[in-house]
Amino acid sequence: MPKMKSHTGMGKRVRVTGKGKIVKQQAGLRHNLEKKSSTRTRRLTGLVEVAKPDVKRIKKLLGR
């Protein structure tokens, strides 16, 4: 039986931490930033943990 391939698109969107948590970049920080307040753009920076209901599906796509 061949090896399972991880989902390339999902691999580019999320990262697995050392403890096994799945983190992602928040949406809304690519364009149209001029109309968004500094507070809002600052709040959107950094990585956030993926919502619990999605974790099982994402781990399956990543082959974990």
UniProtKB/Swiss-Prot annotation:
SUPFAM superfamilies cross-referenced by the UniProt entry: L35p-like (SSF143034)
Recorded GO CC terms: cytosolic large ribosomal subunit
GO process terms (BP): translation
InterPro entries referenced in this protein's UniProt entry, alphabetically: Ribosomal_bL35, Ribosomal_bL35-like, Ribosomal_bL35_sf
Gene Ontology MF annotations: structural constituent of ribosome
Gene3D superfamilies xrefs: 4.10.410.60
Keyword Signal attributed: no
Keyword Ribonucleoprotein annotated: yes
Keyword tags: Ribonucleoprotein, Ribosomal protein
Entry-linked Pfam families: Ribosomal_L35p (PF01632)
Ranges of biased composition (kind: Basic residues): 1-22
Region (Disordered): 1-28
PANTHER family, sorted: 54S RIBOSOMAL PROTEIN BL35M, LARGE RIBOSOMAL SUBUNIT PROTEIN BL35M
Family to which the UniProt record says this protein belongs: Belongs to the bacterial ribosomal protein bL35 family.
Annotated protein name in UniProt: Large ribosomal subunit protein bL35
Source organism of this protein record: Salinispora tropica (strain ATCC BAA-916 / DSM 44818 / JCM 13857 / NBRC 105044 / CNB-440)
Gene expressing this chain: rpmI
